[in-house]
UniProtKB/Swiss-Prot annotation:
GO terms under biological process: global gene silencing by mRNA cleavage; RNA catabolic process
EC top class named in words: hydrolase
EC number: 3.1.-.-
Species this chain originates from: Escherichia coli O6:H1 (strain CFT073 / ATCC 700928 / UPEC)
Subunit organization: Forms a complex with antitoxin YefM, in which the toxin is inactive.
UniProt entry tagged with the keyword Repressor: yes
Family: Belongs to the YoeB family.
Coiled coil (UniProt feature): none
Upper lineage: Bacteria, Pseudomonadati, Pseudomonadota, Gammaproteobacteria, Enterobacterales
UniProt name for this protein: Toxin YoeB
Phenotype upon loss of function: Deletion of the tomB-hha operon causes reduced infection of the mouse bladder but not of the kidney.
Positions of the catalytic residues: E46 (proton acceptor), H83 (proton donor)
Gene name in the database record: yoeB
Length: 84
């Protein structure tokens, strides 16, 4: 499964690399798990509603979520900082 980062999500990821390596490790673990099983597993996967319909979120920390969408052959990371 191909991994695609939105501009915002890549900026989020770079922010975590500079400020908190533990969160980067957690994000990497969640992405690895999501590539294997997109709709179940670590981080309590949850389908989003309304204007984010089609996207899913997984908990990174109490405050931050990984927001993503899955297509046939790719995983689009939309955000990995703050809530949706």
């Amino acid at each position: 499964m191909k991994l695609i980062w939105s501009e915002e999500s890549w900026d989020d990821y770079l922010y975590w690399q500079e400020t908190d390596k533990r969160i980067v490790k957690k994000i990497n673990e969640i992405i690895k798990d999501t590539r294997r099983t997109p709709f179940e597993g670590k981080g309590k996967p949850e389908p989003l509603k309304h204007n984010l319909s089609g996207f899913w979120s997984r908990r990174i920390t109490e405050e931050h979520r990984l927001v993503y969408a899955v297509t046939d052959d790719s995983l689009l990371i939309a955000a990995c900082r703050y809530h949706y």
